[in-house]
Amino acid sequence: MDHLNLCRYLTESILTDLELTLIDENENTLVINVHKLILSINCQYFETLFSGQFIDSQKNNLKLLVPDIHVVRDIIYGFYKNPIKYKNYPDWLYELKKIVCQNFLCLETNIEILHNIIVPTNGFDKLLDTIDLIGYDSDTISLLVGNMPDNYDLTKLPIELIRQMFDVPMFNMIYVSDKDGTFKIGNGNISFNITSNTLINNGHFEFSSIHNKIIYHHVCDIYVYDLLNYTTNKFTNPISHTIKSIVLTPDQEYIIYDSSPQIISKFDFISMEIIESRFAPTGAVVNDIFSSTELGHFGKIEELQCCNPNLLIIGSNVLSFYNVNDMLLMNIIENNIIPNDLYGRIYSSSIKKGRIFVSLLNDIIFVLSSINMYFIKPDTYEYIKKIHCNNFYNHDYCATNNDFWDICNINQDVIAILVGNLLTIYNWKLDKTIIQIDICHTECNGSYCKIDKIVYDSTTKLLFVDCSNSRSGKKIYSILMDNIDLNIPINNVDFSIFSKNKIMRYGNPKCISGIKKFKIIDNYKSKLYNNIEKYLKNNQ
């Protein structure tokens, strides 16, 4: 039967043989005329009821006590290929009620939907009740941890459940979904939404665990999304120039951003005000265009926080690139921000047209250009060494294609270098290549592979490789560096050590449909984990 006709048989009560009265615990009622056959075919609960020797089996009028009359009505309408949704519940509550009702009717429940809803703090107990009903496993326990308020009263929970929650891997990745632009959190086993709507199109984003805020930019605007109350504040750059990149300061109190024409600004994302702006080439304060803003001072930044294509914070310094032949190191001191004459500007004929990739390890700056790799001391700006990049790229690959380049640190002596589809683990102090992995050959079955990013997570000791190809789409692989002796070069590489159990797709494929942008984090839910750890120690 055509589903439209089937739907009409329901809505117009054609040939119905059962008047079904749904009743909830508050004695609210809802009456629908249905067909026993349709209910029996689609639902084991009704099949058992109508085919058994129960008092109600042969009745034409039936009263049924259900968890929620509106949601059960929606489920029954779904049997007739006429999906409807009760509008008076927020999405998160509706989906939880739907799972409860599906469980009541002995229907298969779709736990995946829980990955995509945002449960507010006051709704956590409802989530807990729902999961308690459907059962605990690694997925549902991870969802509990991900949604639990940091200050939740742990005495409400069984001690064994708390132990299982403490064993859930820390959530170490925040990313933007390639499918719908929402932000998600993942820990390698599971991922779930932390925003319900699209927040970002292009540009960088930062995450402040202290303030529970996501900061991102698009064109001339900076957006601050509050994860606790689900609100967004917007700031527009006063000079109406595109914001090129943003960096969160290590104290997580400010954003430093750069915008054309060569202006670096310190921005308070709580008050949504610019603290100070300076013209990068001279260090001069730019205050005539901020007449309504009282200028303050830059605080001292103690350590590296982040590296972006245009901006790098190094201790108390900001390294900013405005073209490939001009690397300007800005020095942030207590009450000023000025170009440091000692550092000056580096002009090198070896740095050709194309992007420059920079990383920092303690007191060494690594600069990867299309020709050479430089090892620079930031205090004197001396070259410790300079090596040719010939060993870092596959000769079948054009080295000038700069979209395929990246660099990151593994430990004090070892860095990961990506050029094209060739990933090199390199001990720079020993000047030795530990291992080289051709991502195209090992992971993409010889098909064209585009590598977008490599990131190392020192907490989990995982090197993440973000790549995509025409066959399998976008993937993120994680390489466990513990499997490699970083002091001993591997001469005859056995790629079997990088088989699927060593380079694995990040997360559960059913949870992650695609990642547009991602950031490795180590502090999401850290307060909750600390509270759980203390509670377990006090209740041994």
From Swiss-Prot:
Residue ranges crossing the lipid bilayer per the database entry: 356-376
Keywords from the UniProt entry: Membrane, Transmembrane, Transmembrane helix
Main location: membrane
Membrane among keywords: yes
Domain BTB: 16-88
Family per similarity comment: Belongs to the mimivirus BTB/WD family.
Protein name: Putative BTB/POZ domain-containing protein R224
Organism: Acanthamoeba polyphaga mimivirus
